[in-house]
Amino acid sequence: SLTSLQTFDIKCEIRFVDNTAIKQEMKNFNSLFWIERQWFFECRAYSTKFYDETLFYSTNPFRRKKYRLSQGKSNKNRFQTILNSVHHVTIEDNNEINENTYYFPHATILTLASKVSINDITIVNNLQRILPLKQIQILEILSDHLCPLKMSELLSYMPNVHTLTFRSMSFDGYGKKLFEQNPLFRLISKINLIKSIHFYGKCTLQNLEIFLKLFPNLQYIEISVELQQIQLVLQYLLNKTNTNARHLRLLCFSCDGKESHYISKLIKSRLLPCDCKTIFDDQHLRLYIWW
């Protein structure tokens, strides 16, 4: 029944000649039923070249913590709508950033889906219209062939990110040494607060060297590694003389039972530079290593 209604979102545009009748209809939404539920609505009239319109929409549309800006859901009217309840914003592609007029003042988690290109020179300005970048604490970048320099540029506007998730890193056209010599690399390595990384792609030793130099405060890394590289990776990460890994305390390998067994054998054989403990999550295929 209507009295059990928990969520009510509405936005409609009405063309009219005489708006008197429309305004009278809208008054029905000022009744006690809506006020008790703290659902409020706004009606705005504006003119175009060919006709007059009324835009009627809910100003407190929902209490959801997450919102996905995808095709057909972005707010493309000329008025900004503020969504206070949302803490996690997911953006599907660059067009949704460019055309959207929603604003999420309390967002702390930002997910940029695979179709979002951070190479777009306008992406920072457009994101700032949607949410306060300095407030973001958890950032997910799911695009392929991610340029580390572009990622660093984006992170320079998000100094409070502590958890970073991404699934690729490409040095095509921009070598590892050039990246490390870039002033932006040195800046990010000094100011960032990132303590946790989740890397979904196959991780190489070169990737790890970059991660630990760029994010010197890392305490947790989740990665997937080719079987033949696992020993080299562990020896590098667990080496006590590796000052870049001095804060690292927990590793998570995305692996199957065979790889988990191989890593456990490595640890028991004492071929690694320090003693470790492990636990295998066979439900999620994750091996955790700590020391």
Regions found by a protein language model. Give the residues of each.
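Eukaryote-biased activation of long, low-complexity terminal tails and linkers
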Residues: S1-W291
